[in-house]
Amino acid sequence: IATFDADMIPQHTFLMKTVPYFLLSRFAKENGKWRLKKEEEVDKKFRLGLIQTPQSFYNPDLFQFNLYAEGNIPNEQDFFSREVNTMRNTSNAIAYTGSNTVILREAMEEIGGFPLKTITEDFETSLRIQKAGFITYATDEIQAAGLTTTTIKSMIRQRVRWARGIIQSLQNTHAIATPRLPLLARLTYLNTFLYWWSFFNRLIFVMSPILFALFDYRIVNSHFWDVIVFWLPAYFFYSMSMRYLSSNVRNQRWSQIIDTIFMPYLIVPVLLETFHIHQRKFKVTNKKKEGKGIGFEFAVFAIPHVILLALSAAAMIRFVHGKYGWALFYSSIILFWIIHNMVSLFYAIFFMLGRPAYRNSERIRAEEDITIQYKALTYEARTADVSENGLAFWSEKPIYLPENKTVEFVITTSHYKARLEGKIVYVKEQDKGWRYSAAIRAVDEENKRQYMQIIYDRTHSLPMQMDLWVTAYDDMLRNIKKRLKQPFKDKRKMPRIPMERQITFTNGAACRLVDFNYCYFSVSDFNTNGSQDDTFIYNTESGIPLVLKRTGIYIRHSSEELLSVVNLDDLTGKNIINQILVDIKNTDEKEG
């Protein structure tokens, strides 16, 4: 039985990467080849009940998006899916996360189907399968991807459901105490339970220096050197263990930031659920994209963090007031503690501020062969990224594709082929080439299906590991700059190609060609040679006649005039429009 969330899209290799696990007990590998075991060789005790592949998402999660970190950190859920869950294989205590999974029907029948008295039926299903004596296994190879939640409200609601549901399931199955699970599995589930109480620990960690520095309330009675001896080694080894165990998917700083963000909203639900005050209603996570940025969510959800930040600032000011020399030195532990917490609180406030979303569909990096056609013109290029409503491709040379005209695109991969049509919406010079962006749609339903497969039948292009060179200072500076920067929409739909050469027209008039974009020439130092005409003809090296007309439009402080290409449609129909660039470039080289 394969299960997927409604928004999850499996890759074409999903079944081939998961189903063979269920056959391992019946096959043996000898001399590099697999053979079917004899009946007496089969281990009857080996019963694989579930294979869990990682949860993966093709859109940035809120930590990546709201903090402008989609190029620096992986999805927040990657740490559990690709690191924690796979490590739980050793204790046979992996968590079924509800999607991207294959379950043995026999195992489902033995436990009586999905449990109903919990709001995390997926987690409890894997727990009951393990209690029934089956092996469960988590892999680290991504085989499906979907949408992660895009609003703070829905993310918090999702985490509350996970917290309450997991505690419900642990209570329903007595997982921590049952003798039907091995000791390692029970310890793993004890750790699972304690994790949800870590948010209460986080609150104590944030409030302790505030209570001491601002209200003179002492949480722990210790001397400066006692703290150094006990705290500093613990801090160091915790940081090292996070770095060693997480494979650069998560570090201590980001763990504390994430816990600080969720802290105010998980303490009460965890407390209620622990004392059997249950939530029974399953609330579906909203994944509809919203692009409002700062608004209601900030005003509501940032309040606890703003209060804690204000208290921390007040505590720091009061604590350092009047201290000098050794007194200030011995106060450094408390100051470091407060500042350390304030950094996480600043992250939380930036997170709650949100960020405007300008795209309706996610853009996924994909390098595939693409053929572009317009009338008699045909070009070969490579896609840069694709989305449901648009695509971008990269060309080594600037090519002519008319503005506001329908262009045909054919994308070909090793498995799919899609014919699309659309219009160029943006062109810019990039990476020693030219990037073209287009708004597109499929020509029919079959091509739409093929195009959807091209987009989603791939591993997403978001980071899989952290950029360890990015510090908290870098994050803060980036957030401030991005939030102060006014959005600018470049509307250029044709390539502007610099020329800088002198040309002479057939009537003796001359000018300096500054640049052109196939539709217009920008010229300076125009000498009409006494002609009163506003139309001029220039013959290129190949003898192509360019009929240019003065528009009366001046740019760049009136130092340059625009000349329109009158016979553009004729040049396009004869498929010689691109030869113009070649001729002018060749002339440049000869003159050089």
What are these regions (language model features)?
Residues 1-9:
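Short beta-strand-to-loop acidic/aromatic patch adjacent to the donor-nucleotide binding site
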Residues 128-144:
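Catalytic donor-sugar/metal-binding loop of nucleotide-sugar-dependent glycosyltransferases
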Residues 12-119, 131, 152-191:
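Long helical/loop segments within the catalytic core of UDP-sugar-dependent glycosyltransferases
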Residues 119-125:
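Acidic donor-binding loop at a coil-to-helix junction in glycosyltransferase catalytic cores
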Residues 195-280, 296-355:
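Membrane-embedded multi-pass helical conduit in multi-pass membrane proteins
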Residues 334-386, 397-398, 456-518, 528, ...:
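N-terminal helix initiation/capping motif
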Residues 366-375, 402-419, 465-466, 497-508, ...:
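Short conserved beta-strand and strand-loop elements enriched in small hydrophobics
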Residues 390-395, 428-442, 520-525, 556-569:
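Short, solvent-exposed secondary-structure boundary/capping segments
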